Amino acid sequence: MRTFIAVEIKNEEVLNAIVKIQSDFKIKATPVNKRNMHFTLLFLGEIPEYTADKVKKELSSVSFKPIDVRFTHVGVFPNPRFPRVVWIGVDELASQKLIDLACQVEKKLEPLGFKSDRPFKPHLTIFRIKNKGVDISQNVEKFKAVDLSKEVITELKLKQSILTPNGPIYSDLQVVLAK
């Protein structure tokens, strides 16, 4: 099964504001469905069920307090002239708390062979761009600063992802609550 560790966005006001940004962005790209909005803390990839059970055991010992998140800006990977992903970033305090949580998760799962190939950068993907050579510098500049409602992260999830022609279908394999 294809799996990852994530924290989800559930605040309807935030989700609707993101959908508005997506519709105002005016680019030929695949928008992320608002029901699939999340921060991927660690991508695990294809794992067998017995490994998922080991992951669940380790995740159950992750401890974190609720995290207040304010969305503050739009960014692009790798850059606005050759974009692949358009994302929304968060304030510095939330960013550090999400980084700390991602590090804690990785530390718990490293003995099982899971390690990120790059440092975690908190971002909420809102578009995936397939066609190359689309310069979206002006769009990014227009949405350089955003101020959406606050989201409070209270759950960490082990998620399964099933890829379909209509986009991924996510399901929860485990939920760890903030303490």
What would you call each of these model-derived segments?
Residues 1-179:
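Histidine-dependent nucleotide/RNA phosphoesterase domain, centered on the 2H-phosphoesterase fold
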